[in-house]
Amino acid sequence: MHLHLARAAALAFFVLPIVWSGQAYATAVAGKPVVEVAFVLDTTGSMGPLIEGAKRKIWSIATAIVDANPDAEIRMGLVAYRDIGDEYVTKKFELTTDIQDLYANLLELRARGGGDWPESVNEALDVAVTKLSWTQGPEICRILFLVGDAPPHMDYAQDTKYPEVLRMARDRGILVNAVQAGSARDTERVWRTVAQMGHGRYIPIPQDGGHLVVIETPYDHEIIELQDEINGTVIPYGPRRQRSDVEHKTKQAAAAPAPVATEMAGYLSRNAARTSGEVITGAGDLVADLKAGRQKLDAVKDDELPDTLRNMPAAERQAFIDKQLAKRKTLNERMAVLVKQRDGYALEQAKKAPAPAANSFDRAVADALSVQIKL
């Protein structure tokens, strides 16, 4: 009975009138569900182990979002925060479908600063709720995770305090979870209030983010090799900066540690099945854009093509593209089979493993998303 009431209350939260005045927003794609998930992450010195864990598990979290709603457009964002006097107070990374770009930004974050105990939690929440480009509309799923170990500075006169920010979040249809690293009592009091006012979950985890479970499978090596082949079908095009970004993504995928590489491949495989065979996130892959009908080959300027295509006659260009399309289709089909086998094996191994002594950051987030996205 209590569970039904809780779910009904949460559902009621999402259908309240949404207020957007004064806030940046994106426009929903007609007829397509949208799931937006942002993290407000403390990046002061004490959060180092958790941040490093987040870098390793961001792809499993992204996969959990896709698995909870396979038909949705997925957008993720991040607000990193420290305190006044540190290198930065907040650093905003906009909500985006380009998860590889978000991953690249996450890799650049380092845990530093935060000499006194409280941090600029109020400002960070305010930036996340009012400055990120949440999609406008009543049928959008918007979820925020506050992740930190220290309470907010309540003595900063210029800040909008968290109770008011959470009222704005409610008006905008943003559900707010509070993930507490460590066991500080003053933080717990605030984090519980944040979760209650935000209609989310209070989630306590160990200071280091908990034990991140990595299950090796017999399919991992082949998945990594196959992803390298798939990335070889990418043809960067467009302005020089865009081509450089695409090349960086394929190099970054190749350089990722094996556990990260396999989870990244799992997400990208799911994404390819949901799109026109896209194998990187974001713009700039000519093969994907031609297949999706977003681009025509004869409309691309020569100076926006890679050297391999620029020096080819028009007929040879088309033949080369067709070959890449066919190769990608075959490789993506093989990858989908391998990922399914890997997921099945990992699930069976997880069932056999002893229950962890404490929750971990990635499991806690995935568990919350599995419920909240389906409301």
Per-region residue spans from a language model:
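Bacterial N-terminal signal peptides
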Residues: A8-W20
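A general alpha-helix detector
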Residues: E304-L305, E316
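N-terminal secretory signal peptides that target proteins for export/translocation
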Residues: M1-L5
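Eukaryote-biased recognition of electropositive, low-complexity segments
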Residues: Y162-L166, R172-V176, A184-K291
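Divalent cation-coordinating acidic motifs and surrounding scaffolds
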Residues: S21-V213, T217-P218, D289-D302, T308-R310, ...
